[in-house]
From Swiss-Prot:
<comment type="function">
    <text>Actin-depolymerizing protein. Severs actin filaments (F-actin) and binds to actin monomers.</text>
</comment>
<feature type="domain" description="ADF-H">
    <location>
        <begin position="5"/>
        <end position="139"/>
    </location>
</feature>
<dbReference type="GO" id="GO:0015629">
    <property type="term" value="C:actin cytoskeleton"/>
</dbReference>
<dbReference type="InterPro" id="IPR002108">
    <property type="entry name" value="ADF-H"/>
</dbReference>
<keyword id="KW-0009">Actin-binding</keyword>
<protein>
    <recommendedName>
        <fullName>Actin-depolymerizing factor 1</fullName>
    </recommendedName>
</protein>
<dbReference type="Pfam" id="PF00241">
    <property type="entry name" value="Cofilin_ADF"/>
</dbReference>
<dbReference type="InterPro" id="IPR017904">
    <property type="entry name" value="ADF/Cofilin"/>
</dbReference>
<dbReference type="GO" id="GO:0030042">
    <property type="term" value="P:actin filament depolymerization"/>
</dbReference>
<dbReference type="GO" id="GO:0005737">
    <property type="term" value="C:cytoplasm"/>
</dbReference>
<dbReference type="InterPro" id="IPR029006">
    <property type="entry name" value="ADF-H/Gelsolin-like_dom_sf"/>
</dbReference>
<dbReference type="GO" id="GO:0051015">
    <property type="term" value="F:actin filament binding"/>
</dbReference>
<comment type="similarity">
    <text>Belongs to the actin-binding proteins ADF family.</text>
</comment>
Length: 139
């Protein structure tokens, strides 16, 4: 279904891969991109379960916007093992203005398509999505 504000559709693979991450933990992360030709949000990269947060941040292009999902494992103060699913809106300052506008106008609707997201991070610079910042959002 097309996004009314931006005219973008969400490719079915996005929802399928997200459900696999959420229910079977098949992936550690998913990176999504907007395909300007098809005017559709598509899966760009899939992170294997053994890949870490550094692999995830390295997979984001330095000069292009992306959406992403990361399944973070952590230990609570009570020493309980937990995980949370994070939604990232990556919009580096060096990205094209048109791209930043397209990603910004599509974000909320796309996020609603992915049921089960627990936290959101918006970043324009790698320092805004450091592992310490992400961990601080688990409380």
């Amino acid at each position: 279904m097309a996004n009314s504000s931006s005219g973008l559709a969400v490719n079915d693979e996005c929802k399928v891969k997200f459900r696999e991450l959420k229910s079977r933990r098949t992936f550690r992360f998913i990176v999504f991109r907007i395909d300007d030709t098809d005017m559709e949000i598509k899966v760009d990269r899939l992170g294997e379960p053994n890949q870490g947060y550094g692999d995830f941040t390295d997979s984001l292009p330095a000069n292009e916007c992306r959406y992403a999902i990361y399944d973070l494992d952590f230990t609570t103060i009570e020493n309980c093992q937990k995980s949370k699913i994070f939604f990232f809106s990556w919009s580096p300052d060096t990205a094209r203005t048109r791209s930043k506008m397209l990603y910004a106008s599509s974000k909320d609707r796309f996020r609603r398509e992915l049921d089960g997201i627990q936290c959101e991070i918006q970043a324009t610079d790698p320092s805004e999505m450091s592992l310490d910042i992400v961990r601080s959002r688990t409380n």
